[in-house]
Amino acid sequence: MNKNFTLLVSFILTFFISETSTAQSWEVYNTQLQLQSRLIYDEIDLLSETVRIGKRGNELSLLSNDFKPAVSLVGTEIYQYLEPWILVKGPNGIGAFHEYGQQVLPLEYEKIQTYFNMLLASKGNEYWLFQRGFNKTTYLGELDEAKITNTGLIIIRKGDEYSMPLSTNPDKTFELLSDNDGEFVLAKEPSGFGLINREGDYVLDPIIETLQHTHGNFYYGFNQDQYLLIEGNDIQSNIRYNSFHKITFENDIMLEYIHGKLRRVMEDDGILLDDVGMTKVEKVGKDLYNVYFRDEKVGLLGKKGWLVQPMLEVEEIKNGSEGLFPASSNGAFGFVNSAGTWVIPAQYAETTLFSENFAAYRNTHNWGVINSSGEQVANASWEEIKPFQKGLAIAKANGKYFLLNTFGTTLNTEGFDDIYRTTDGFFMVERSGKSGLLDSEAKEVIPTEFEGLRRERKDFVIVQKDGLTGVINETGEIIIPVAYEKILVDWANDKIFTKNSFTPTVIQIIEEPSKKNKRGA
């Protein structure tokens, strides 16, 4: 072989090896651990059951079902995935692809808002709108503000004027267009306030003097000396309640006063409680109110009526569980029932809710446990006690965590730095920066010796040790050796991805010297 050719091949191979020496090898298995294929990518991201991203060097690709590059995503990293939109970041900004592969916005924007059939992009105070139905991008101009509402309307503001560029009357201006968590936009014109549906049409004409959103599709207003409770509707909004008596809406509490006296607790579309003698109402939770009366009684009111009947000798009643409600008297807490009777006298500085017939209580600084009869189960010697589930509670003492049973006995003699409960009753534990796993009876199934541990499902635990990743089951048996950089699992498609570094094989082509026959001696 020619010597110059040999040198040229060696140079090319050396260059190729130096360029690819950082490549990553991925092996794809099914969930029965049968090898399906091998892939060469630096990174693989599973964004959804059907959207997979591969990165090789500076090239980012949307992958096909067989994990081959199908569409180049142009950018260098995935900025965000908001189904069905893939936002991609590049040197000059953010752009967008549809998950089917179509690039719809170049990578040059600062911000992109998404909706299932449109995108709103901006650079500084300039805005562009992409509409998938028309497959086009429209320049909206220089604006002070623009947004997509949760119903898909576009609201823009320029100075003090608002408009809806996608409505049937895009040039119409408003004094206010306000989005909320309901399905209707609150609009204001010189004639008053109204409500606009997702098509951009009025379902409540703009004639209301004042109007504000309360919850969902409900609104509180005032017009022509009447207080109004209004429910939005796609065709025509309905006035659910109206009154010439004063209705206030402050701190998420709606009250009606008759002749200056508190008479009714209101809900979004009508009367929740009509009673005489009320002096004040305080909100203590979602749709929960403490109602105070002139005769010094206090009751707990819920969405469907009294949760705790008004009772004496109580200052506050909290939401409860298992038929018992934490309540305070003279600064101490105990428990009352729904009839307004003390079941456990007020004697604690603080209590938790009952769970599986047990609750935690605090005296001064430390916590203990009582049962639903008020009997002490565990002394107040704990810094923290979490609710009982399946007969066990997580408790903290001297900065360490323990598992506590319903007899007040700890199941682990040596404390952990932290304990996390899994959804099916197992416990992830940490000690000295290492993780392990306990079963539902607090028995060790995986020793506390891993830097990371994630229980994907029963008998499939992804672990990290010494910078490498593997999979073990709950008996400690190795399923996938702890020898990989990363492991990804796609249960929906029956795939397991393992990542490993590799160094390409160096191929040397050496020209052997020509052999000459020697003459015999």
Where are the language model's segments positioned?
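Residue-level detector of conserved, function-critical positions
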Residues: 24-521
